[in-house]
Amino acid sequence: MVTLISYISLLAGFVIIASVFYLALVKIKLI
């Protein structure tokens, strides 16, 4: 149970980092 929660939180953090990096890349391309 604890490992599942930690895995989900890790996956969520990875998704957030990936989305932020994607938005930054799009802004660089627009400029």
UniProtKB/Swiss-Prot annotation:
The signal peptide stretch is none
Give the principal location in a single coarse category: plastid
Where is the protein found, in the record's own terms? Plastid, Chloroplast thylakoid membrane
Q: What does the entry list under GO cellular component?
A: chloroplast thylakoid membrane; cytochrome b6f complex
Quaternary structure, from the entry: The 4 large subunits of the cytochrome b6-f complex are cytochrome b6, subunit IV (17 kDa polypeptide, PetD), cytochrome f and the Rieske protein, while the 4 small subunits are PetG, PetL, PetM and PetN. The complex functions as a dimer.
Task: Output this protein's name.
Answer: Cytochrome b6-f complex subunit 6
Provide the function of this protein: Component of the cytochrome b6-f complex, which mediates electron transfer between photosystem II (PSII) and photosystem I (PSI), cyclic electron flow around PSI, and state transitions. PetL is important for photoautotrophic growth as well as for electron transfer efficiency and stability of the cytochrome b6-f complex.
Keyword list (alphabetical) reads: Chloroplast, Electron transport, Membrane, Photosynthesis, Plastid, Thylakoid, Transmembrane, Transmembrane helix, Transport
Gene Ontology molecular-function annotations: electron transporter, transferring electrons within cytochrome b6/f complex of photosystem II activity
Which parts pass through the membrane? 4-24
Family stated for the protein in its record:
Belongs to the PetL family.
The record describes its membrane topology as: Single-pass membrane protein
Biological process terms from the Gene Ontology for this record are: photosynthesis
Tell me what organism the protein belongs to. Tupiella akineta (Green alga)
